[in-house]
């Protein structure tokens, strides 16, 4: 996009293509809806917060520390939930007067899944992007049936080149102008030369970062 340098631009495709394909394409996000984004300081998380706010949604997001909750608010989330201190499902229910949320963007899986299904509003959508906490869960499909819920999920990497190209074209048309006028910005936490790739991986595995970690060619 115009007005975005090459390092910042490197942090755009993976996370914004992924969140577009899931939150916009699969969940059909609309203005005025309410969204819960798990892992709000991850690359997927911050991209989801910023894109949802640009679409006119109310955003809840989770993180594990006070510092990360502050970052979530800086990204634009309306509600930052420290999941070590608060029950994210209760906060969402309380702040929506029991209605629940329209969309949950899940990057955790495991025992989060039944709790997320339980907090969806009528016609709500749960989209699963990653499953580090586990690929199996017990879900009350009576709720899915009675509340007309949708459970879906997808990843970018297994998609065909034409599918990825279509997603990129949609971003170019809709999201690139938001970057050009600074309505949306990227969040780069750290950059490393390729020779320090192991250090970058250690930082990522520590989960201390907020935003993207970028590997750069020497001299950039």
What are these regions (language model features)?
Residues 66, 85-90, 110, 114, ...:
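Structural motif corresponding to alpha-helix initiation and N-cap regions
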Residues 88-98:
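Short amphipathic alpha-helix with an adjacent loop that forms part of the alpha/beta core around
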Residues 176, 181-190, 198-220:
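C-terminal capping/lid region of NAD(P)-dependent oxidoreductase domains
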Residues 31-33, 101, 123:
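Phosphate-coordination loops involved in phosphoryl transfer and adenosine-cofactor binding
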Residues 5-86:
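Mid-domain Rossmann-like dinucleotide-binding core that forms the NAD(H)/NADP(H) cofactor-binding site
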Residues 55, 72, 111-183, 216-220:
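Glycine-rich phosphate-binding loop and adjacent beta-alpha segment
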Residues 81, 104-105:
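N-terminal Rossmann-like NAD(P) cofactor-binding module of classical short-chain dehydrogenase/reductase
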